[in-house]
Amino acid sequence: MDRKREPVRALELFCGIGGFAEAACEKADVVAAVDQSEIALSVYRLNRPSTPVKGFNLETVSPAVLADFNADMWWLSPPCQPYTVRGKCRDLEDSRASSLRRILSILPQVRPFSLGLENVEGFAASEARNLLVSVLKSCGYRIREISLCPTRFGVPNRRPRYYLFASLGELGEMDEAKISEYSMRDFLDGRPSPELALPPGIVERFGRGLPTLDPDDRNAYAACFASSYGKALMHSGSYLVHNGGLRRFSPDEILRFHGFPAAFKWPPKLGLRKRWHLAGNSLSVFVLRRALSILPHFK
């Protein structure tokens, strides 16, 4: 009789609202989730009350603290702003890259068996990526880098991202079959809130420049939702034709595009704009669940 494999002990760094935990829930035991944002951690706690949640600054974390988690793998979703045009592409000179640099300085001393990282596509051409790969190779890791988008798996949301997987063991292959043939309506609220509607004056002034979608167009896909959605009008996501005008997508709809479960909850007092921010900052559970199969623990 085959013995059931024990769940991998995973340390979720820059955890946000818990995208990695959702993607890895069947095969991983998250021993701790770490983030600086207390608001993000409040969402994480609400949905995963049994997971230890730690709010501390990774820029100054010690090797002993990370070693004490005794994790088989580390998952990293570090800040993307240093590698985006809006973030001025300052790369490792950006102070928001300091936490990643600190973790990489510790890695040779702790060396988890596996490691995974997700970031914007611009990370692939960054000095941060070069440093990451250099450190991993010096520690003897096997490395796989890949660019993936939910549209590749049949999800109508364009969100291309850079992924890196590294392990001291053998790396596997990813199942690239489509998850499903989704349509736009599969992700929409049954009764959208009236507060999602764009004011008529905004539509009249900017409507032609906004990426708009017809919910009944089976070929339509939403643009990447950024953390600025709901705050910045342009270059932050798509808008939906609705009741003769346009409306924003709700945070719950964005989470459905990401693959979060229907049972996922927001703290009752958390405002709409902050929900948009956290949803836009999160990762694609759909994509990561497939991509994790590259690592030995998730085959």
Predicted regions and their residues:
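Conserved beta-strand elements of the Class I
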Residues: 9-11
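Class I S-adenosyl-L-methionine
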Residues: 61-73, 80-231, 246-247
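Conserved SAM/SAH-binding beta-strand->alpha-helix loop
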Residues: 37-38
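S-adenosyl-L-methionine
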Residues: 42-68
